[in-house]
A protein has these predicted regions:
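Long, hydrophobic N-terminal alpha-helical segment
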Residues: 2-54, 59
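Ordered, amphipathic secondary-structure segments that act as subunit-interaction surfaces
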Residues: 61-107
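Short basic, glycine-rich beta-strand/loop surfaces that mediate nucleic-acid
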Residues: 10, 49-61, 70-84, 117-124
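Gly-rich Lys/Arg/Thr-decorated short loops/hinges at beta-loop-alpha junctions or inter-strand turns
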Residues: 1-5, 112-115
């Protein structure tokens, strides 16, 4: 069985937001945006706004972490996949579940209680840092990059 064509995995807790997904889709050439989040997958009322925001001609799917692990290897060769997750923990669960992720771009992680800002768009807590460190130990390439044409911030800001 061929490996699924995962072009990029992106951590962005807004998922499909404004022009961001359009720019990222253009940059990597995906034709399927896979939103992987247990909460969103369980609530189809949240899907419509994201589907409307997706670029024309790009499919969107909403799966839980476990469903993604279970079916990612059934992707066809013509599916060029951009995976969107909300957190490093979800990305780590995918990798540990056998999803062949090689690179993760961190774009937006909301500030909040017990979260410290590391860039204007990324705030982390201790669990995020631990998950990112583990991903790095597993050989996953990590970068902080807001938009495809922006310069990446060093991952050392986080880990």
């Amino acid at each position: 069985m061929a490996q699924p064509k995962i072009l990029l995995t992106r951590i962005d807790d807004r998922f499909i937001y404004g022009q961001d997904v359009e720019l990222w889709n253009e940059a990597v050439g995906s034709n399927l945006v896979l939103i992987v989040n247990d909460e969103i997958a369980a609530d189809s009322r949240k899907w419509a706004p994201m589907r409307v925001s997706a670029p024309e001609g790009v499919w969107t799917r909403f799966f839980s972490v476990q469903r993604t692990v279970d079916i990612i290897h059934t992707a066809t060769p013509r599916q060029l996949i951009l995976i969107m997750v909300a957190s490093p923990a979800d990305a780590l669960a995918l990798v540990k579940g056998g999803v062949p992720i090689t690179k993760i771009s961190i774009g937006h992680m909301r500030a909040g209680e017990d979260r410290r800002p590391v860039t204007p768009a990324v705030a982390v807590d201790d669990a995020d840092v631990a998950a990112l460190r583990e991903l790095q130990k597993l050989g996953i390439e990590l970068e902080i990059r807001y938009l495809p044409n922006s310069n990446p911030d060093p991952i050392q800001l986080v880990i």
